[in-house]
Amino acid sequence: MNRDLLVKDDSNTDFTPIVNNEVIVHNCNKETNKGTLNYKYIVRDNKIEKTTVTFTAREVNLGDYISANNINNLVSEGVTTSLKNGSADFIISVTIDHNINSYDFTSIQSDLNNLEMSLSKIDDYENAKINLGTSFTCE
């Protein structure tokens, strides 16, 4: 057997450890009077790569559904939205790609406030968690 194929001959080369750049998924949840909020953070090295905010309606009115519809109609690079079900049991999801900084939520801010959703450009997970407040349970 050829030993030179199995063993690296250059013994003077410094050892470089492999850095673990695994993605970690963090979830933060909160119950509100109107429904449930879930923030799902995709994090690598404490930097958020993607955030998905989901509001699941429980006790809502037509105005809340209109807010969800307005959020769903947001067109912005780096933001994907999804609205499911009817006006009484809707689920609205907003996914933000943190590699893109051009998104703007000012046109839907009152709708976000109505559903108690917070969409921030904070890309550090620990700061994003602090920004949510103590009423959220994060795992």
Model segments located where?
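Subset-of-secretome marker
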Residues: L6, N12-E139
